[in-house]
Amino acid sequence: MINQPRNRILPNKNNILGILGGGQLGKMIAMSATKAGYKTHLYCPKGDNPAETVVNSFTHGEWDDFDKLVEFSNNVVCATSEFENIPSKTLELLANKTSVIPNSKVFRSAQIRSKEKEIAEKSGFKTPKWYLIKNTDDLISASKLMENGGILKTNSLGYDGKGQVRINKHSNLFEIWENLGSVECVLEEILEFKREISIMYFKSTDNSDGFFPISQNHHENGILRKTIAPAILNIVDERDLRLKTKKLSENLGLYGILAVELFELLDGSIVFNEIAPRPHNSFHWTLNGCDNSQFDILIRTMCGLPVKDVKSNGKWEMTNLIGQYENIISETSKDQDYILYLYGKHETKPGRKMGHLNKQIS
């Protein structure tokens, strides 16, 4: 595996940054790279890829097309991914050819829920009670230990509420197991919480680091609908949360950015939910609410440029545009304080993120 770069990568014709994945996050990563003076090369399968419109070059290929991946890696000085569920063999191949930020260990930990929880617990986070489920016998036994029911989640390849089902004592466990593909799962207890929050830590390959202000989030059906930031958290809790997040990042060997999603329970305690080693929907407000957005900071961490804590320039609200969004735009267009971001996706589907709105609220 190629070591993480220590020398600064400055903009020039030979220093091309690689981006894996052609969606809205890849697009916004590329736009920040361009703003900073870098050229970008995108790798993604053919499809509805809005990032293709803003990069300098792109390669269409599947995630197991190793010849094309090698060609891509030979053309970039380092690479990052817009999503965590990139195949392990793909990451291993790329890591032997170029510098991948964050590293493959970070991505693997984010892909497997059980590993994610184990490393969170090792870092000092409290997690929901959970059980690894390998078969229906495990599921039956573990479900009896969940007094208030639980959430059965596939151990890998789940995001935005996909690959998970709530269960209770009346559930048909055999049917649910089959519907999830009869694959390894985790069963988590259902928590009563006051709110959902997220924190983002970042570390440059020059070893400087920092945090963004904390976000408060509202989800519906597993999909983020609205974020308000900065979230108000008492100083002791915020300091403790930063320490644990930094410890988690150290245990992962992180360079790049890391979002950590959490629950604040009714008693004020904070419980780990999951990580995302990439730009995160709950920090899209930073595009307007900070001097450096999460995408700008990712570029700096990739290129070994110094970073530090980022402060907000007020209180911001981010609203996702999901599925058919025209009515929302019709209403919000009456208020010039809304800043509209459309991702340029051609096909509208229920539950698909099509854009977002940012607005300063104080």
Kindly give the residue locations of the regions a language model identified:
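ATP-binding N-terminal substructure of ATP-dependent carboxylate-amine bond-forming enzymes
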Residues: 1-111, 137
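Active-site nucleotide/adenylate-binding loops and adjacent lid/helix of ATP-dependent enzymes
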Residues: 109-198, 202-248, 362
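Phosphate-binding core of ATP-grasp and ATP-grasp-like enzymes
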Residues: 180-233, 239-272, 276-284, 299-309, ...
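A conserved FAD-binding loop/helix module that cradles the flavin
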Residues: 286-288
